Amino acid sequence: MFKNLWRVAIVVPRRLATSAEATKPASSRTKRRSTVTQQIVDHFQTSEQFRAHYPYMNPDLLKRRHNVPIGINCMSESDAENIFSSIKGHLNPDIPIIELYPGLGLLTRRLLTLNPKKILAYESDAYFKSVMDSVASDNAELQVYKTHFLRIWSDDLKDKLDGGNRVAQLLPGIEKKEWEDEPAVQIIGVTAQPRYFQFFVNCIAFQCGIISYGRMELYMTVPPEIFWNINCNAASLPMIYSKYLLFNMFFDYELLCLVDEKSFVPWFKRGDRKIAFLKNLDVNRDKFCLMKAVPKRDLLKVIPPRLLTSLWFFTYQGTTTTRNKVIPYLEKWIPDCGPLFISKGLTVFTDFRDLTSNELLDIFVTFVSLPGFEDCPFQAALESFLNRTDDEGLDEEVDRATSGFGVPEPVE
């Protein structure tokens, strides 16, 4: 069953180059790419660190991409300082820090001034890894790993299957804590991938991976479309999917500051359809959002650990169908339970995408407290759902989900 959790919980989309770009003459594509590269280089010319390292950097980082990269690096001294100034008052130097994709270490060097107990940096680019190794050589509290942080999920899965200690080797010195205690680790990074939020949600729902050490404190810099999707009040608002509803149920979060989107590489194309709803929210679409998020301290009192996966399945099933009516869905599992929910204000026409995350959570809590829940087919359906796919191709999918993002096709 553990193998299937990866296949069910982390969707691995296939990356295909657009046929229009592929059919254009090679000379035309090369000219446009070099122009975009020069624009990016010119943008960072005021950075002394960038000028020193630019000749040795992976050139693909300096090309705008069609798809969203999984790793994003900060190249701006000023925005690294902006991020540091916004989070340093929240950080506890006695709690280990994890930094994702530190790049040239602009933020890392600032974090080291806090005299932290430990910094674990995860960098997938070979040259940036060498830069970080040189920083670590003068700072014993800094340890650098060449890997994608998302691989902790698959490593945890393999540990469960063969009794290994892969996760412990990637997270040395992190002490396990009770849920109600202070966070076990502070995670800092930049991402434009909704997959990261799906990853953190799934770790809580399945009580595995990084969450097996206790709660984590997140400081994530994300595009505005991700933050404002999370911050939407109802599932009917644009682009809010089950992972965002569950994120609202599981986490408390706040916006700390805004930073320029061009301060990070690689630059990438953001689809107009995905950001169109921001026009109605009066927000700056060119500014990334630095957010702080912490799993709710009382979460396991509201939802016992044994029911977290059930909540994940309940939310996933309800919100991934375009128009799924709540009461017929509930009565599919427990017949004649509808009148109770009608008395709570629902109608037979209410669908899941009309509900806020708090309303959906309240419905779930009521649903699992019904006398017939333990004997209803809901749990059997959950088990069947988790075991629906076979085990073939797991390692290939894990590789494609992490290292497989290597060199996407650049765009104009």
Where are the language model's segments positioned?
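Catalytic cores of RNA-modifying enzymes
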Residues: 2-312, 375, 389-411
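Phosphate/oxyanion-binding loops and surfaces in catalytic or ligand/nucleic-acid-binding neighborhoods
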Residues: 233, 237, 333, 370
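Short, amphipathic C-terminal "tail helix"
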Residues: 352-410
